[in-house]
Amino acid sequence: MRLYNRINAIKRINQLAGKGVPFVFLINFEHNCSYIEETNAIDTDELLYQFGTKTNYRHTNTTVKPHPIVWSPSPIPFEEYQKAFHQVKNNILKGNSFLANLTCITPVESNLSLDDIFVHSEATYKIRLANHFVCFSPETFIKINNGIISSYPMKGTIRADLPRAAEKLLEDEKEMAEHATITDLIRNDLSMVAHKVSVTRYRYIDKLTTNSGKILQTSTEITGRLPDNYHQNLGNILFKLLPAGSITGAPKKKTTEIIKEAENYDRGFYTGIAGYFDGFSLDSTVMIRFVELQNGKLYFKSGGGITCQSNAISEYQEMIQKIYVPIY
């Protein structure tokens, strides 16, 4: 498996997109390590992908879903989470950040393999890098169609079975503030690479099904127009937008420093991005909902946005709520 550093990744993406060659890419959180391969050269034993209806998975190599499914997370103690939370929130109260995405790594006991999770998960975006990780993400990073770039930051989660769940989510002041901040950040990000940037849909609700029930999430759509020659510069465009604002915070550079210090683990490809270019259009995802294989054991990486209105108990519970597989 060939991996590229930042400079060579930009060159490779520009080269392939400029020639209209279909390819898939994975870029890690620190955007210093990338997998880039033409679609007709991808070995399915190495990489399986699904971007909407675009996939290299063939049902001839299907796996049998274990029954019953064993899924037993062991979250870090609340006291440990609280320490990282206070480190982040203190920076927010000092004015160093307005929004910070704090994440954790959680061991999970399961009878599911990476292939099992890829094959049987219900998600818009799925990635399985053999012996490394599987991702089943609901979140789009950017889409590009006919020169229009669109982003869909996703912020705000609630259990769908709660009374008035949708109303509670939309009326939650903390969620409102977090969503407004990330919308402003992404709008500014897109303005670095596009013009006529605008918010076309604000805080719309999607329903997701998990192995432990349904959840509601709010997203916003932001669009802009790219220059006519964007294909030749697709690599530069992508890397200028990294890391993704929805999984870092605002202001992005300082907040990234804050969360790296507080988290005390390597995100790796978690919260990086993955994308599929078909020769004309691009679809890409933020790699959240992420299970990693380390020394034969599974680890789930999850987190959430911290603002000045956040409290540690609620954020800890949200982090745990996201430790699921969408298999049902």
Describe each PLM feature range.
Residues 1-328:
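Extended alpha-helical targeting/anchoring segments
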